[in-house]
Amino acid sequence: MTLAVVASGCANPTGGEVSLEPRTAPGQPAGTILLAAGTDFASTVQRVQEAISETGGSVTTVVDHAADARAAGVAIPPSTLVIGGSPAAQLPLLRIDQRAGANLPQRYLVRQGSDGSVSLTVDSADYVAAVAGVPDPGARTALRDSTTAVLGQAVPGPPVPVPSPLVGVTPSNYLLTVASSASVATTADRLRRGADRRPTRSVAVVDEAAGSADPGPAIRPTSVVFVSDAQADAPLLAAAPSIGLDLPQRFVVWLDDQNRTQIGYPDVRRIAARHGVAADDPNIAQLAADADRLARLAAGII
């Protein structure tokens, strides 16, 4: 199994090959924390939501991958993504680089294997920082502590394991970007409205700047829009269940230090590589086309 994950400001959506490198744990993507969570799938999903709320965060949305896949005519084992976390824990990373918002709030994937066992997977704080190009270890501490608290409450008992290594994870060409002609609010709304046309749909919109009213400096306007394409997502979830951690797709919209609105979205080919899916898979091509179209539409280019 091999991998290359990459992040930057102005990558070409059509350029570059994905180089892959071995990872150490089968079924566990680079830069993640994976816990065994017993055999009760529904209770685990509920405990994750409660843990987020009880540790000072909020649940943004819950995505039932299995239900969405079923609606698309594909049967997969139970798989649910819980998106949410503490706004305060995100701020140190966002203050250094708003592109970190492409992987915030945290995403917790609960899935059940064919043997009935339930697992819980989440990105490590080191991964979120790495793909955003934030080298400062101190900026990751709040997110790491918050994630550990959620995991410890959702799956009580065993200590939270060490994250898998950041094999092949770099901040180069991970985030594709397009400059928008409008404000952050207008651009995010364009994204949402554009996504609500078949085959895509908007799943959630998060104002990440809203949580910055603490003693530290406020961050510039930053929003994230989550977008699903069930027809393309479902076959990928069936072939590579761990990719549920990175679906639905997300778009971060922010005001940069030159007062320009930017739209950034992870290159889905890099996401595919992280989960062992071929970059030329037709469903990956469909998601890439969706993302490019929506970004250009929101930017006012088309």
Language model feature labels by segment:
Residues M1-L3:
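Sec-dependent N-terminal signal peptides
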Residues V6-G9:
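C-terminal motif of bacterial Sec signal peptides marking the signal peptidase cleavage site
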Residues A11-T14:
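Bacterial signal peptide processing site
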Residues G16-R70, P159-V203:
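Terminal, regulation- and interaction-focused segments at domain boundaries
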Residues A37-V45, V62, A100-G101, G113, ...:
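Solvent-exposed, acidic/flexible segments
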Residues F41, Q46-L109, R193-V252, I271:
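Ser/Thr-rich, low-complexity intrinsically disordered terminal regions
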Residues G101, R107-G133, R250-V277:
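Beta-strand/loop substructures that line and gate deep hydrophobic ligand-binding cavities in soluble
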Residues A125-P163, R269-I302:
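C-terminal partner/receptor-binding element of secreted or periplasmic proteins
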